[in-house]
Curated annotation (Swiss-Prot):
Superkingdom classification of source: Bacteria
Family in the record: Belongs to the RemA family.
Protein name in UniProt: Putative regulatory protein CPE1749
Coiled coil: none
Lineage: Bacteria, Bacillati, Bacillota, Clostridia, Eubacteriales
Entry-linked InterPro entries: RemA-like (IPR007169)
Pfam families according to UniProt: RemA-like
Length: 89
């Protein structure tokens, strides 16, 4: 089984197999999801102090903040430029 990894900006990489949604942080429901994840300790801030432009939701209920546009992350997800790690299980 191979693990597909996606760069979400500034050298941060997440497993593409675990992504559920990539959304914009502008709406009130998404802001509420971010706050609830922060309260639960499930928020990962990968913005390096920059403005949050994409919110990535994973199947483990982690919420990841990225400074890269959602369209850019989605494009990286659909291209062949991703890092693939072979797992010997």
């Amino acid at each position: 089984m191979s693990i597909k990894l996606i760069n979400i900006g500034f050298g941060n990489i997440v497993s593409a197999n675990r992504l559920v949604a990539i959304v914009s942080p502008e709406s009130a429901p998404i802001k509420r999801i971010i706050q609830e994840a922060r309260d639960r300790g499930m928020l990962i801030d990968a913005t390096y102090g920059r403005r949050t432009r994409a919110v990535i939701i994973t199947d483990s209920d982690h919420v990841i903040l990225s400074a890269v546009q959602p369209e850019t992350v989605a494009h990286r997800l659909s291209t062949k430029e991703e890092v693939v790690v072979e797992d010997d299980e």
